[in-house]
Amino acid sequence: MPAHPPIKTVAVNTWDFLRKPMIAPTGFREYDARWKYPDEINLPGMQALGLGIGTQMHEMGVPPHIAVGNDYRDYSLAIKYALMTGLSQAGITCHDIGPALSPMAYFSQFHLDLPAVAMVTASHNPNGWTGVKMGFEKPLTHGPVEMARLRDIVLAGEGIAREGGKIIEVDGVMDAYIADLVGDFKLSRPLKVVCACGNGTAAAFGPKVLEAIGAEVIPLHTELDYTFPHYNPNPEAMEMLHDMADAVKQSGADLAIGFDGDGDRCGVVDNTGDEIFADKMGVIMARDFAALYPGSTFVADVKSTGLYASDPVLKAHNCTTDYWKTGHSYMKRRVHELGALAGFEKSGHYFLSGDIGRGYDCGMRVAVEVCKLMDRNPDKSMSDLKDALQKTYTTPTLSPFCPDLEKYEALEKIIADLEVHAKEGGTLGGQKIKEIVTVNGARCQLENGGWALVRASSNTPNLVVVTESPESDAEMRAIFSDLDAIIQRQPNIGEYDQMI
């Protein structure tokens, strides 16, 4: 029996809010679903989403079994139960793995031999957000095609109820996940590591994993607290990175590793307190992997440094890098398609495959691999490994506000303006635009090897801006200033989340 279409405007504190599904259509993103709760979705709406996911599973011929987990937010458990109610209504058996990291949920597909996964999480979004990451083909998660079809099923009320659904509570997945991460590896050198969790879900995992491999752990906000009393756990944000840097300086640690709210991303600070942006950390890891697996293919997202293409160590080991669309689902799929050894995103998603991972993004797996890297270089510090890279000057990820319903149109106009600017011989930071790559937004390649990127965020009402210079901090800032002047021509651009 088909469902009724949900109400597309959420009316909080009304009679219907407690009974009828209400879902803002903007929550269906390119590769997952995210809403402000309860302003953009209610619990009956989440039940309708579960019914839609279950209906899509039947439509795609996926066996009716799914792993379901939730992150550590005060409302995530209620949302998970609503989602599982809808999945069960669709005739799906839900294997409830309990509170989890997103990569633990992905791991559970392999551990429990299940075809599908649904993880209730808002990822690194701040409190007040919720969402679901889902996938029907391990280790992959939904991309734009699957998300568009899911959106249509849910918003048109095409979910179909079936018999046979149920919920099974599964214990032991967390212990199995940690054991899988640790394996038989033990550090052979002393290593003092600041473990930064921002009081998010990773606090239940990070210290245990690092201690199990023999690291001396310096805890930083490793108490579970869903109010996030210090800051939102996001290792791409300078606030968290600065806190990690201060902890390194105060403790004399060898490095700091920080995790986001659902543990699929991580960030690194070296022994001097320098923040290593995730794309640069990826080059350090790629160099290490290249020596172990020469001839490997890597994937980097379009926000990442140009060093993947120019690094002499990667070239010496006959390694190649494919630049691809930003987004965890895009990157997972690209790594899978190319048979790449690893993929790296500037946001801190790393996709380790082949002999070093299963292809999904797992901050805990990366933490272990970073420690292994240090173990393979016993005479070097993290700053030594960082300083061995060619020096470039890169902004953090900068995100000006732009409404969800307007950001893609605004981006198209910005790209058109950039193309005219380039055609007329215009410059960014005094450097002529050599090429504009539009695989994901616009990445302007400059004559001296610098670049500037503007794209639309897939997860939040923002654009995303990054610039890099091989010459100087001043040129990096000048590139940003010139790009921002073009961006600001659009009337619907708001304030940046952070500035350089």
Per-segment meaning from a language model:
Residues 71-79, 197-204, 304:
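Glycine-rich phosphate-binding loops at beta-strand->alpha-helix junctions
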Residues 115-129, 248-270, 275, 322, ...:
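Glycine-rich phosphate-binding loop
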